[in-house]
């Protein structure tokens, strides 16, 4: 970002706990005790108090099942602080929205993905770890568009848009809509739909993007995985995926031509 910062300050900005651990490791052999002062991130608005009751993935022990789940999905470690663990998701949500889940009979653990803007949580998503249905539960706390990553995006640059919040963590300056409709009001947006050329609904949606003159990524045939996280798990690197995105982003007449070759269903 063009702004110099020491490792300590970088860690402080990223996650105060990581900064604290770094300083402890750096000075643990010194004779003099080190006094460390830092401020926890301050979250405001509905749900802020309840969010503090959960543990960040970055604070879980390495052998914790949730931490292992995140590592197995190869989520970049610098973003673990954005994710939280709710042992009883329904019960926790009810502390934010009273009686949101009247029955706690089938309560279960979920990964909590908060949506922030200017340190205010305006929505959250609970992702199942197993076969629980629905796989994703997205809850709006304010009447605004569900866009994950607003607190980190630079609107002066090209903004990439995908569906899944976890997928967005693998692409620089990327946000997620947490729904199949990826359209956002931004001239330099590049929409990254899932790689489903045989899914009629996805294909119809992409056709609409092209008609509305959005820049759209149409994954090449040699990419077999459905989404970015699956590509990462299959062995592709973030750099390789970014190269594929750059080389297969289309708009206008060219987008229509490539779409006709990419689509494997009639719409």
Where are these regions (language model features)?
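Phosphate-handling DNA/RNA-contact segment within nucleic-acid enzymes
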Residues: 91-188, 193, 201-203
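Hydrophobic alpha-helix position signal
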Residues: 11, 70, 74, 209-210, ...
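A short beta-strand motif that forms part of the nucleic acid-binding face
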Residues: 2, 55, 128
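TOPRIM fold recognition
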Residues: 134-135, 156-159, 164-267
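TOPRIM metal-binding catalytic domain and adjacent DNA-binding surface shared by DnaG-type primases
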Residues: 14-112, 118, 243-267
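Alpha-helix initiation and N-capping motif
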Residues: 4-8, 20, 63, 67, ...
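Short metal-binding segments enriched for Cys and/or His
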Residues: 1-15
């Amino acid at each position: 970002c063009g702004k110099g910062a020491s490792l300590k300050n970088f860690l402080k900005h990223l996650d105060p706990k990581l900064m604290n651990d770094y300083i402890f490791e750096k000075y643990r052999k010194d004779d003099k005790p080190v006094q460390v002062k830092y401020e926890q991130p301050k979250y405001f608005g509905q749900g802020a108090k309840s969010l503090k009751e959960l543990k960040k993935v970055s604070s879980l022990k390495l052998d914790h099942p949730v931490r292992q789940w995140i590592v197995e999905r190869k989520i970049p470690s610098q973003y673990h602080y954005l994710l939280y663990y709710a042992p009883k998701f329904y019960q926790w949500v009810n502390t934010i929205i009273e009686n949101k889940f009247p029955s706690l009979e089938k309560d279960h653990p979920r990964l909590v993905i908060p949506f922030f803007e200017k340190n205010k949580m305006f929505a959250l998503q609970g992702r199942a770890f197993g076969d629980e249905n629905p796989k994703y539960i997205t809850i709006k706390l304010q009447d605004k568009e569900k866009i994950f990553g607003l607190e980190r995006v630079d609107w002066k640059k090209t903004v990439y848009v995908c569906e899944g919040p976890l997928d967005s963590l693998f692409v620089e300056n990327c946000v997620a809509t947490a729904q199949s409709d990826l359209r956002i009001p931004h001239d330099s947006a590049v929409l990254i739909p899932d790689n489903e050329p045989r899914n009629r609904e996805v294909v119809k949606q992409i056709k609409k993007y092209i008609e509305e003159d959005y820049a759209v990524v149409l994954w090449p045939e040699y990419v077999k995985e459905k989404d970015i996280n699956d590509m990462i798990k299959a062995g592709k690197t973030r750099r390789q995926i970014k190269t594929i995105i750059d080389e297969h982003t289309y708009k206008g007449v060219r987008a229509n031509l490539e779409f006709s070759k990419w689509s494997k269903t009639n719409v």
